[in-house]
Structures are given as C-alpha cells and as structure tokens.
C-alpha cells in the first residue's frame, strides 16, 4: 500500500511498530503531549456514546457528553491552544466536538460541517450496502469485512483509492485553513475501514472475525511533519480503543 509508516508510542519515544503490535491504540492525549511544535495532527475519531437513535438527529447520552468533556479536560492539562473542530453533519458528532471544546475550556470555537466525515464515505452503492447489511449479519460484519478483506466491491469503493482521497484530497489539501491540532468527529463506518487502511490491515477491529469493533472516541491520528510526511497512529479517547 502506498502510505507512510505506522508508529507506536513506547517508553517516551516514537518508533516504527512491528506488525504484531499494530492492533494497539495509543491514548489520544499522549499523542498530543508528544506532538512536536513543528508538527500538526488531525484526530479522526468516532463520536462519543450515543443514544439508540441512529439517524442524523440522534444525540449523545449523558454519559457520552461526560466522556467528551473529560477528554477535553485531559487535553487541557497538556496545552491551552485552540483546536479546530469538524463534524459529519450529525447531531452526535457535533455534540462530541462541542463537549470536548467545553471540557478543555476553549471559549472561541466553531464546529465546521465536513461532508467527507459522513459515515457513508466508503459506500459506492447505498442500496447494495444496505442489502448486504441485512443479509450478512449486520453493518459491523459487512463494513469490517470490506475494510480488511476487500469484500463487497459492488457496494464499496476501492479501500486504498478512497482512503487516499479522504486523507490527501480532503484533509491534507485543506490543512492550511485548520490549526495545529484538529479534531474531526465521524462515525464507526468511516473509522473502521480507515483503520484497516492506515494500519495495513492490522488494527484490532475485525468484527467479522474477532468480534471487536471500534470504541467511542477512538480512531486515527494523522500526524503531518514539517517536511510534509505523514504518519498514522490508532488512538483512543477512552480507556480502550475497542468494544
């Protein structure tokens, strides 16, 4: 695959991960704490805990709001700079950004709607994706099988091509209008295939095989160095990156 190295944080230093380690998640706050002044980071994470309402207007639970505020408070202990926030257009992703910002005490923030953070980013044919979801054991099975095995090519875009469009054409191309630290709140159906891509298939979210799924506020940190090179780190905002 044509993307940069996957790194892991170990004993105070970054190093290239071994394939056996590449299913681990690093605390998002640790990644921020170890970010160099010349680097930028984009945290692409799933929203916090939601209610049973899965539509666009579904809210976070009270616990979900609390978890996001607590993450913000932990981030504030590292630094006081303002973050950029983007969301998918869904209420629960907006509320995740809002509560992280409030938890870190950021007064001046706007939360920008980013269409490319929609959970259907990888979906080529929505009707076929829904049909497979109904026939093959649910969305967690279908989306993880797609991300890790390339299944359902009639329903989903090519993983590498679509991931590069997201990372390079949407995020990197617009990084100049963002801040040093950026939080983009999205959905599990985007995060799981993206984790599959950025870890060369090693991330521990292969629900179809291992019954592991990405946890709330977990996802990928995209770190952009001063020379323009990029590295990716699976990150967690809660105690564990999977559920």
How would you describe each model-predicted region?
Residues 55, 137, 170-171, 177:
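Intrinsically disordered, low-complexity regulatory regions in eukaryotic proteins
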Residues 40-46, 86-87, 177-190:
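Beta-strand elements within well-structured catalytic alpha/beta cores of enzymes
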Residues 168-171, 188:
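A well-ordered secondary-structure block
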Residues 57, 190-191, 196:
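Catalytic toxin/effector domains delivered as secreted proteins or via bacterial secretion systems
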Residues 78-80, 173-179:
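Glycine-rich phosphate-binding loop signature in dinucleotide/nucleotide-binding domains
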Residues 117-134:
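Short alpha-helix plus adjacent loop in nuclease-associated cores
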Residues 163-166, 186:
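Extracellular low-complexity, Gly/Ser/Thr-rich intrinsically disordered linkers
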Residues 2-121, 139-163, 199-230, 234, ...:
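Active-site-proximal alpha-helix that buttresses catalytic centers in soluble enzyme cores
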